[in-house]
Amino acid sequence: MITLGVDPGSIVTGYGVIGKSEAGFRVFDYSAIRPGGKCDFPQRIKYIYDTLEKVICAYKPTQLSLETAFYGKNAQSALKLGQVRGAIIILAMNYNLKFVEYSPREVKKSVAGTGNASKEQVAYMVKKMLSIDDEKMALDTSDALAIALCGHFKSASMAASEFKKQSRKATSWGEYILQNPQVVVK
């Protein structure tokens, strides 16, 4: 499974593409998208969309993990963030990607072990987990990689849980019928 993690922002949007192999995680790409403040807002959204579309076409992820909206005190910033998130969600739907989103607390907990971790602690853990030696990595980018890792961990956990449900053995004929109603001929 290849996961594209996105830390959305109206000024800087971070992204990271990771996959899991037998040897561990593989990092395909990561960067910060900076449309520039001189273009108008719709052009910034288009720039973010176009850049992420190129990433999707290049790496063919199966899942897009996005951080849920952060609710700050500035309503205008929240509206802009919502528009960026909307464009990213549409992009995921256009490419039939599994779309999942996680709160900042969930992401921090899955990577750093605590939902109260600082951005710097998250960046440190991401670099350790993915064997990245990049002193200049933007925090938006390390957040995006953390979001991708969280998506990967949660998907693997859900798959294991579903497998457990499917492989439960019935201890009696009645339980078998209850667990498999499709086998009953009426």
UniProtKB/Swiss-Prot annotation:
Protein name stated in the entry: Crossover junction endodeoxyribonuclease RuvC
Residues that coordinate or bind Mg(2+) 2: E67
Gene label: ruvC
Function noted in UniProt: The RuvA-RuvB-RuvC complex processes Holliday junction (HJ) DNA during genetic recombination and DNA repair. Endonuclease that resolves HJ intermediates. Cleaves cruciform DNA by making single-stranded nicks across the HJ at symmetrical positions within the homologous arms, yielding a 5'-phosphate and a 3'-hydroxyl group; requires a central core of homology in the junction. The consensus cleavage sequence is 5'-(A/T)TT(C/G)-3'. Cleavage occurs on the 3'-side of the TT dinucleotide at the point of strand exchange.
SUBUNIT field: Homodimer which binds Holliday junction (HJ) DNA. The HJ becomes 2-fold symmetrical on binding to RuvC with unstacked arms; it has a different conformation from HJ DNA in complex with RuvA. In the full resolvosome a probable DNA-RuvA(4)-RuvB(12)-RuvC(2) complex forms which resolves the HJ.
Record note on cofactor: Binds 2 Mg(2+) ion per subunit.
The enzyme's E.C. designation: 3.1.21.10
Protein location: Cytoplasm
Similarity-based family: Belongs to the RuvC family.
Reactions mediated catalytically: Endonucleolytic cleavage at a junction such as a reciprocal single-stranded crossover between two homologous DNA duplexes (Holliday junction)
